[in-house]
Structure formats: structure tokens, C-alpha cells
């Protein structure tokens, strides 16, 4: 019953669903108090199989493996297993910017949130970064959602469709969960853009062969890439002569690297990704400079 589980319970209950929270461990007493106060049933130190007889869906917490008996039985009984971001995304029609990658997610999300806040776009920062998407939708909705998403959350999406997806990089960390199957891990990260259509945007690092080899020629969405060089038709941010350059349609935004809020080479890439997304959302150059 981590943060995403409690947030999902809250949101589901507020939308009129019958909800049970089930945890194989002991549930914290504060959480129990909250669940009782809003009339949500729970069970602890056990996942009872009888719930699978009536459940329409299971919202799975990121830490739970697909190989547990409970999950295997749910799959056998054809009960859909979804992640909390999949569930939450059904309850908003505001723009979602989802950010994933092996490294740099939190920095990029925080920077993007700061820019959008300065642009008065009323953003919310949520996901894998402290407050779950469901919790924010239930308690404090905004006008645009900056969402940090992990491969664990992407593994169980069905229709989750961000307006803007950002993929920062793909490297072989966190493979223990995937039996050291890096191809499966990389493919899971790519799911961030699988449901996008021609109105949506996919922003990615164009010097990462693990990403490039997975981008299909039939991609429907608008592609915007970033890297050191302006070397392809969809490059939207690059470095030239110690300047960060971001291209939006025909307009160029330039900023000297030493003037940037975040210093360090990896942060140049994080800033490029956040900058491209900001320009797509109509943020002015003056706000970007702040």
C-alpha cells in the first residue's frame, strides 16, 4: 500500500468504484485510519483469491512482480492488470507530459514543472516523484500534468497516451527485475509513446542507438529529437558554439551554456528535453530564460 496504491484507492472511490486495498505486508496504522475514514475495505498480510471472482480490474503497485501467484491467477482469470498511471489518466483531459529514461527523469520533470509554473500554466508534478498521479487528480487537479514514469508503471498500461512523451536515454541499469533482459527493459520504456497519434509529440535523445533502433518509420506522432548535433530532420535541440539551441517551427531560441540554471553535460540534455516540451506548450523565450 505505497503512495500510488493509496492515491488510486482515493481516486477510484471518489469516482464511485467499489475498492479493496490488498497488501501482502502489514499496513501502516495511519493508512488504516485513512482507509476507515473514507470507507475503503482492506486486507493485510494476505492477497485473498476470492477478490478475483468479482474484480473488474487490478491496479498493481510498481514493486509487485508479474511472477507472484496472485498476479498469475489474475492473468489466468483474465482480470485486467493495470498500473496506477493507466487508471488515473482516464480521469483527465488536460495535457499530460510523461518523462521516462534510465537517468535524469526527476531533474527533467522538476525543471519542466518550474518552467511551466513560471509560465502560469498551473502545472502539477506527480508520478514516480513523490505524489501519485491519482492522488493529485483526487485532491489537487491542475491544468497540465508533468509525470515521471518508470518502466514498472509502463509495463501495465493499455491506453495511457501522453500528449508529450519524453525518453531521455536507455542504459542497462535496473535489469535485476527483468532477469537481465535488457531488450525487454528497453522495449518497456518505449511503451511511453505506443498509443500516441498525429496530434501528440515524442521527444527523445537522438544519440542513443537503443532508442534510434526502436523508432519506427510508421510513427504517427510528431518526432522531436535532441543531442549534440543538428543532424536530422527532426532535431529540435542541439549545441553549437557553446550555445543551447532549441528550434520550434522556424523560430530559434538560443542560450549560452554557462547561463543555464543547471550546469553539467547531462543537464544540457535534460534542459533540451524540458525546453522542447515547453516550446510545444507555447512557453515564451523570456520565461525559458528565467
Question: Could you say what each language-model-derived stretch is?
Answer:
Residues 1, 179-186, 220-290:
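Adenine nucleotide phosphate-binding catalytic loops in nucleotide-utilizing enzymes
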Residues 5, 28, 105, 132, ...:
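Flexible, glycine-rich phosphate/dinucleotide-binding loops
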Residues 1-83, 87, 263, 283-286:
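N-terminal leader/targeting and accessory segments in enzymes
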Residues 26, 30, 83, 197, ...:
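Short, solvent-exposed coil/turn linker segments
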Residues 11-14, 49-53, 62-222, 238, ...:
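Phosphate-binding loop of NTP-binding sites
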Residues 5, 92, 267:
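Short, conserved glycine- and acidic-residue-centered signature motifs
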Amino acid at each position: 500500500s505505497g503512495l500510488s496504491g493509496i492515491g488510486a484507492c482515493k481516486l477510484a472511490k471518489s469516482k464511485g468504484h467499489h475498492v479493496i486495498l490488498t497488501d501482502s505486508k502489514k499496513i501502516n496504522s495511519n493508512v488504516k485510519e485513512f482507509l476507515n475514514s473514507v470507507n475503503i475495505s482492506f486486507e493485510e498480510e494476505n492477497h485473498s483469491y476470492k477478490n478475483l471472482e468479482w474484480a473488474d480490474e487490478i491496479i498493481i503497485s510498481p514493486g509487485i512482480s508479474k511472477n507472484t501467484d496472485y498476479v498469475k491467477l489474475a492473468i489466468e482469470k483474465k482480470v485486467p492488470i493495470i498500473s496506477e498511471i493507466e487508471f488515473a489518466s482516464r480521469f483527465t483531459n488536460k495535457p499530460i507530459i510523461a518523462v521516462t529514461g534510465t537517468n535524469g527523469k526527476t531533474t527533467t520533470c522538476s525543471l519542466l514543472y518550474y518552467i511551466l509554473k513560471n509560465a502560469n500554466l498551473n502545472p502539477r508534478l506527480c508520478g514516480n516523484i513523490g505524489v501519485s498521479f491519482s492522488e493529485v487528480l483526487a485532491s489537487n487537479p491542475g491544468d497540465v500534468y508533468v509525470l515521471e514514469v518508470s518502466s514498472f508503471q509502463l509495463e501495465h498500461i493499455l491506453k495511457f497516451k501522453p500528449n508529450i512523451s519524453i525518453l531521455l536515454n536507455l542504459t542497462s541499469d535496473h535489469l535485476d527485475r527483468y532477469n537481465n533482459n535488457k531488450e525487454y527493459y528497453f522495449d518497456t520504456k518505449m511503451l511511453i509513446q505506443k498509443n500516441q497519434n498525429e496530434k501528440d509529440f515524442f521527444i527523445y535523445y537522438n544519440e542513443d542507438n537503443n532508442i534510434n533502433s526502436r523508432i519506427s518509420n510508421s510513427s504517427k506522432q510528431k518526432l522531436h529529437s535532441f543531442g549534440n548535433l543538428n543532424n536530422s530532420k527532426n532535431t529540435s535541440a542541439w549545441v553549437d558554439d557553446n550555445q543551447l539551441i532549441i528550434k520550434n517551427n522556424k523560430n530559434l531560441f538560443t542560450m549560452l551554456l554557462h547561463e543555464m540554471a543547471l550546469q553539467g553535460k547531462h543537464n544540457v540534455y535534460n534542459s533540451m528535453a524540458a525546453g522542447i516540451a515547453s516550446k510545444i506548450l507555447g512557453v515564451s523565450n523570456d520565461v525559458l530564460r528565467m
